[in-house]
């Protein structure tokens, strides 16, 4: 997890429109996925709470916590991941049998609370880990170590598979279909497991109002092009597209959080942003970043896996969610008074305005 600025080197490309003048933005919303890949938007906003500690824990300190959490763990090596965020200290511990373990320790009070909720959710999800319900693995907390500052560090063994490579997604059965089925299986989980974990639960109208509030707040910065504000407000005020059944959503899906082996999804990580909300949120990153010829296969497999599925405006809300990620990136920069983030968000919003000029999210 990193709150660093997303790279801005994605190539430009043309806008593709359908017969209803709706747009499928290939770029710069590819960069929206890059924002998400840094885990910077939702996590940075949700984790900016009081700091529990003033010094980042070293990998060796985290390895020591792992030996407390998992008695008998024989540490052979310890590494810090390449992506390190501001909410958690994270280390990879390799034991004498060459097994890999992850150690996470919260840095802020809010991160500590989120970690506890995530653990509760993961424990509840264990009963659904089978081919009929969840056909992939999720982290299984193996042990805990109490922190002197308060809260707990959690240790879990690494899951099989490698991070999803979006360029491997293609049309037809295979990995794209597996991704679609995996997302659908999340959205078929009972809402009670999220509610019982103390994570947020929204109805459709409340969630629409939250999105409107985000747009209003972004508008007050004076840095969002007027045409984008009109585009977003038009979609948000079209109540027809907001008639959906809220589902369990992962809330922080990125390529790094989806593990694959061959043509199958083997695991999904990073559940601390889970909630009951709009299923379109989990599709946004794929709609803007997956190869265009793979999207139909993803959505077909997704639709077939859902039960009693009727949501004709799902992809429209997904594209909107991807665009609004840029507004949240801007707001994060404003709140933290980070001029580099603000400038980056403004540049991406300008690109988005150029590529969506005259196009509609909804007809």
Regions found by a protein language model. Name each.
Residues 25-77:
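Juxta-kinase regulatory segment immediately upstream of eukaryotic protein kinase catalytic domains
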Residues 79-198:
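ATP-binding pocket architecture of kinase catalytic cores
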Residues 147, 153-169, 188, 212-218, ...:
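A glycine-centered beta->alpha junction motif in the catalytic cores
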Residues 57-74, 191-250:
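An alpha-helical support segment within catalytic cores of ATP-dependent transferases
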């Amino acid at each position: 997890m990193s709150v660093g600025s997303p790279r801005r080197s994605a190539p430009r490309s043309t806008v593709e429109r359908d017969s209803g003048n709706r747009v499928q933005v290939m770029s710069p919303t590819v960069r929206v996925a890059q924002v998400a890949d840094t885990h910077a938007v939702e996590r940075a906003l949700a984790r900016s709470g009081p700091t529990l500690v003033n010094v980042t824990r070293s990998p060796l300190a985290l390895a020591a916590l792992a030996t407390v959490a998992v008695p008998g763990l024989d540490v052979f090596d310890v590494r810090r991941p390449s992506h390190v965020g501001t909410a958690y200290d994270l280390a990879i511990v390799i034991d004498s049998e060459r097994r890999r373990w992850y150690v996470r320790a919260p840095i802020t009070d809010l991160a500590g609370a989120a970690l506890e909720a995530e653990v509760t959710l993961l424990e509840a999800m264990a009963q659904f880990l089978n081919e009929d319900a969840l056909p992939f693995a999720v982290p299984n907390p193996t042990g805990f170590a109490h922190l002197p500052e308060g809260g707990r560090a959690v240790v879990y063994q690494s899951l099989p598979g490698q991070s999803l490579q979006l360029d491997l997604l293609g049309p037809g059965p295979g990995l794209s279909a597996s991704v679609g089925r995996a997302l659908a299986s999340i959205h078929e989980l009972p809402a009670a497991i999220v509610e019982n974990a103390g994570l947020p639960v929204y109805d459709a109208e409340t969630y629409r109002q939250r999105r409107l509030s985000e747009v209003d707040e972004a508008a007050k910065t004076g840095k969002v092009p007027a045409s984008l504000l009109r585009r977003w407000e038009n979609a948000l005020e079209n109540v027809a597209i907001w008639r959906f059944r809220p589902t369990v959503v992962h809330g922080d899906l990125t390529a790094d959080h989806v593990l694959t082996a061959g043509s199958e999804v083997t695991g999904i990580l990073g559940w601390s942003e889970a909630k009951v909300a709009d299923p379109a949120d989990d599709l946004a990153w794929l709609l803007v970043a997956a190869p265009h010829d793979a999207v139909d296969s993803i959505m077909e497999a997704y639709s077939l896996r859902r039960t009693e599925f009727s949501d004709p405006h799902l992809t429209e809300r997904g594209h909107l969610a991807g665009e609004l990620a840029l507004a949240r990136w801007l707001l994060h920069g404003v709140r933290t008074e980070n001029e580099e983030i603000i400038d980056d968000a403004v540049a991406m919003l300008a690109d988005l305005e150029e590529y969506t000029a005259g196009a509609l999210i909804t007809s």
